[in-house]
Protein backbone atom coordinates (compact mmCIF):
# COMPACT_ATOMS: atom_id res chain seq x y z
CA UNK A 1 0.00 0.00 0.00
CA UNK A 2 3.00 2.28 0.34
CA UNK A 3 3.24 2.40 -3.48
CA UNK A 4 -0.32 3.59 -4.10
CA UNK A 5 -0.99 7.16 -2.91
CA UNK A 6 1.21 9.77 -1.25
CA UNK A 7 0.75 10.16 2.50
CA UNK A 8 -1.24 13.38 2.07
CA UNK A 9 -3.48 11.85 -0.59
CA UNK A 10 -4.08 8.81 1.62
CA UNK A 11 -5.05 11.06 4.54
CA UNK A 12 -7.40 13.07 2.32
CA UNK A 13 -9.04 9.94 0.97
CA UNK A 14 -9.52 8.44 4.42
CA UNK A 15 -11.01 11.72 5.69
CA UNK A 16 -13.44 11.81 2.77
CA UNK A 17 -14.37 8.19 3.47
CA UNK A 18 -14.75 8.99 7.20
CA UNK A 19 -12.41 6.13 8.06
CA UNK A 20 -9.53 6.10 10.50
CA UNK A 21 -6.03 5.76 9.01
CA UNK A 22 -5.74 2.41 10.79
CA UNK A 23 -8.17 1.10 8.15
CA UNK A 24 -5.82 2.08 5.31
CA UNK A 25 -5.23 -1.08 3.29
CA UNK A 26 -8.55 -2.73 4.15
CA UNK A 27 -9.70 -2.52 0.54
CA UNK A 28 -13.10 -4.21 0.98
CA UNK A 29 -14.02 -1.78 3.78
CA UNK A 30 -12.73 1.21 1.80
CA UNK A 31 -14.75 0.12 -1.25
CA UNK A 32 -17.93 -0.23 0.79
CA UNK A 33 -17.41 3.20 2.38
CA UNK A 34 -16.61 4.73 -1.03
CA UNK A 35 -19.99 3.60 -2.36
CA UNK A 36 -21.76 5.06 0.69
CA UNK A 37 -19.92 8.38 0.38
CA UNK A 38 -20.62 8.59 -3.37
CA UNK A 39 -24.32 8.71 -2.54
CA UNK A 40 -23.74 11.27 0.20
CA UNK A 41 -21.49 13.61 -1.83
CA UNK A 42 -23.33 13.31 -5.15
CA UNK A 43 -24.43 16.79 -6.31
CA UNK A 44 -27.81 15.51 -7.54
CA UNK A 45 -28.55 14.32 -4.00
CA UNK A 46 -27.60 17.64 -2.41
CA UNK A 47 -23.97 16.77 -1.74
CA UNK A 48 -20.78 18.76 -2.19
CA UNK A 49 -19.56 18.63 -5.80
CA UNK A 50 -15.93 19.44 -4.89
CA UNK A 51 -15.82 16.65 -2.30
CA UNK A 52 -17.29 14.26 -4.86
CA UNK A 53 -14.67 15.17 -7.47
CA UNK A 54 -11.82 14.82 -4.99
CA UNK A 55 -13.17 11.51 -3.66
CA UNK A 56 -13.51 10.10 -7.19
CA UNK A 57 -10.06 11.21 -8.31
CA UNK A 58 -8.31 9.86 -5.19
CA UNK A 59 -10.23 6.59 -5.14
CA UNK A 60 -9.68 5.97 -8.87
CA UNK A 61 -5.98 6.74 -8.43
CA UNK A 62 -5.86 4.23 -5.56
CA UNK A 63 -7.64 1.59 -7.66
CA UNK A 64 -5.27 2.12 -10.59
CA UNK A 65 -2.25 1.94 -8.29
CA UNK A 66 -3.45 -1.25 -6.60
CA UNK A 67 -4.14 -2.80 -10.01
CA UNK A 68 -0.66 -1.88 -11.21
CA UNK A 69 0.86 -3.42 -8.04
CA UNK A 70 -1.15 -6.60 -8.71
CA UNK A 71 -0.07 -6.60 -12.36
CA UNK A 72 3.56 -6.06 -11.35
CA UNK A 73 3.27 -8.95 -8.91
CA UNK A 74 1.90 -11.15 -11.69
CA UNK A 75 4.90 -10.28 -13.87
CA UNK A 76 7.39 -10.90 -11.04
CA UNK A 77 5.85 -14.13 -9.82
CA UNK A 78 7.47 -16.95 -11.67
CA UNK A 79 7.68 -18.97 -8.47
CA UNK A 80 4.26 -20.63 -8.81
CA UNK A 81 3.44 -23.18 -11.46
CA UNK A 82 0.02 -24.34 -12.53
CA UNK A 83 0.95 -27.86 -11.48
CA UNK A 84 0.87 -26.70 -7.85
CA UNK A 85 -2.75 -25.56 -7.98
CA UNK A 86 -4.87 -26.35 -11.01
CA UNK A 87 -8.20 -24.70 -11.64
CA UNK A 88 -10.70 -25.54 -14.37
CA UNK A 89 -14.00 -24.28 -12.94
CA UNK A 90 -15.51 -20.86 -12.31
CA UNK A 91 -12.67 -20.03 -9.96
CA UNK A 92 -10.49 -19.38 -13.02
CA UNK A 93 -12.20 -15.99 -13.21
CA UNK A 94 -9.52 -13.80 -11.59
CA UNK A 95 -12.05 -11.13 -10.58
CA UNK A 96 -14.19 -13.36 -8.35
CA UNK A 97 -13.85 -12.99 -4.62
CA UNK A 98 -11.98 -15.65 -2.65
CA UNK A 99 -15.05 -16.19 -0.47
CA UNK A 100 -17.27 -16.75 -3.51
CA UNK A 101 -14.88 -19.36 -4.86
CA UNK A 102 -14.45 -21.34 -1.64
CA UNK A 103 -18.02 -20.78 -0.45
CA UNK A 104 -19.03 -22.92 2.52
CA UNK A 105 -15.59 -24.58 2.55
CA UNK A 106 -13.71 -21.31 3.16
CA UNK A 107 -13.42 -21.86 6.93
CA UNK A 108 -11.95 -25.33 6.36
CA UNK A 109 -9.34 -24.03 3.88
CA UNK A 110 -8.26 -20.76 5.50
CA UNK A 111 -6.20 -22.56 8.19
CA UNK A 112 -5.96 -26.24 9.07
CA UNK A 113 -4.43 -26.16 12.60
CA UNK A 114 -3.85 -22.92 14.49
CA UNK A 115 -0.86 -24.05 16.60
CA UNK A 116 0.92 -25.69 13.68
CA UNK A 117 0.14 -23.30 10.82
CA UNK A 118 0.62 -20.02 12.69
CA UNK A 119 4.27 -20.93 13.37
CA UNK A 120 4.89 -22.59 10.00
CA UNK A 121 5.72 -26.02 11.42
CA UNK A 122 4.02 -28.04 8.67
CA UNK A 123 5.73 -27.29 5.36
CA UNK A 124 3.37 -29.60 3.47
CA UNK A 125 0.16 -27.84 4.58
CA UNK A 126 -1.99 -26.50 1.74
CA UNK A 127 -4.32 -24.21 3.70
CA UNK A 128 -4.66 -20.64 2.41
CA UNK A 129 -2.64 -19.26 5.34
CA UNK A 130 0.30 -21.60 4.69
CA UNK A 131 0.25 -21.12 0.92
CA UNK A 132 0.40 -17.34 1.35
CA UNK A 133 3.17 -17.69 3.97
CA UNK A 134 5.24 -19.84 1.60
CA UNK A 135 4.63 -17.32 -1.18
CA UNK A 136 5.89 -14.55 1.14
CA UNK A 137 9.09 -16.48 1.94
CA UNK A 138 9.76 -17.31 -1.71
CA UNK A 139 9.26 -13.72 -2.77
CA UNK A 140 11.64 -12.56 -0.05
CA UNK A 141 14.32 -15.04 -1.19
CA UNK A 142 14.03 -14.04 -4.84
CA UNK A 143 13.81 -10.24 -4.53
CA UNK A 144 15.81 -9.84 -1.31
CA UNK A 145 13.30 -7.40 0.10
CA UNK A 146 10.33 -8.24 2.27
CA UNK A 147 6.99 -7.84 0.54
CA UNK A 148 4.45 -5.58 2.25
CA UNK A 149 0.67 -5.66 2.59
CA UNK A 150 -1.10 -5.56 -0.80
CA UNK A 151 2.06 -6.85 -2.52
CA UNK A 152 1.54 -9.89 -0.31
CA UNK A 153 -1.68 -10.91 1.43
CA UNK A 154 -0.19 -13.25 4.03
CA UNK A 155 -1.18 -12.97 7.68
CA UNK A 156 2.33 -11.79 8.61
CA UNK A 157 2.22 -8.84 6.20
CA UNK A 158 -1.25 -7.93 7.48
CA UNK A 159 -0.07 -7.95 11.10
CA UNK A 160 3.12 -6.02 10.36
CA UNK A 161 1.34 -3.39 8.26
CA UNK A 162 -1.24 -2.67 10.96
CA UNK A 163 1.07 -3.44 13.95
CA UNK A 164 -1.22 -6.21 15.22
CA UNK A 165 -0.13 -9.08 17.48
CA UNK A 166 -0.72 -12.74 16.69
CA UNK A 167 -4.19 -13.39 18.07
CA UNK A 168 -7.45 -15.03 17.13
CA UNK A 169 -9.03 -11.58 16.79
CA UNK A 170 -6.48 -10.29 14.27
CA UNK A 171 -6.66 -13.60 12.43
CA UNK A 172 -10.46 -13.23 12.22
CA UNK A 173 -10.19 -9.75 10.66
CA UNK A 174 -7.48 -10.94 8.23
CA UNK A 175 -9.62 -13.85 7.07
CA UNK A 176 -12.60 -11.50 6.53
CA UNK A 177 -10.40 -9.31 4.32
CA UNK A 178 -9.15 -12.34 2.36
CA UNK A 179 -12.75 -13.59 2.01
CA UNK A 180 -13.70 -10.25 0.37
CA UNK A 181 -10.60 -9.92 -1.84
CA UNK A 182 -10.40 -10.72 -5.55
CA UNK A 183 -8.68 -14.02 -6.24
CA UNK A 184 -6.19 -12.32 -8.58
CA UNK A 185 -4.78 -10.40 -5.62
CA UNK A 186 -4.01 -13.60 -3.74
CA UNK A 187 -2.68 -15.13 -6.93
CA UNK A 188 -0.66 -18.05 -5.53
CA UNK A 189 -3.98 -19.79 -4.93
CA UNK A 190 -4.57 -19.90 -8.69
CA UNK A 191 -1.14 -20.75 -10.05
Curated annotation (Swiss-Prot):
Species this protein is from: KI polyomavirus (isolate Stockholm 350) (KIPyV)
Signal peptide segment: none
Domain J intervals: 12-80
Zinc finger region(s), C4-type: 117-130
Assembly description: Interacts with host PPP2R1A; the interaction inhibits PP2A activity.
Domain writeup: The common region of ST and LT proteins comprises the J domain. This domain is essential for multiple viral activities, including virion assembly, viral DNA replication, transformation and transcriptional activation. This domain is also required for cyclin A-transactivating activity of ST.
Pfam families the record matches: Papo_T_antigen (PF02380)
UniProt cross-references to SUPFAM superfamilies, sorted A to Z: Chaperone J-domain, T-antigen specific domain-like
Protein name, per record: Small t antigen
Gene3D superfamilies: DnaJ domain, Small t-antigen, unique domain
One GO CC annotation: host cell nucleus
Highest taxon listed in the record's lineage: Viruses
Keywords: Acetylation, Activator, Early protein, Host cytoplasm, Host nucleus, Host-virus interaction, Metal-binding, Oncogene, Phosphoprotein, Transcription, Transcription regulation, Zinc, Zinc-finger
Subcellular location: Host cytoplasm; Host nucleus
Amino acid sequence: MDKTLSREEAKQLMQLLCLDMSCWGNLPLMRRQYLVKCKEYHPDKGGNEESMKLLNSLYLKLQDSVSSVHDLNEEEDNIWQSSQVYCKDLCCNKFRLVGAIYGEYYEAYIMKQWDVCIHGYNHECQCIHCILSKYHKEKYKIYRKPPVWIECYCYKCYREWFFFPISMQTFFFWKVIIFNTEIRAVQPLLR
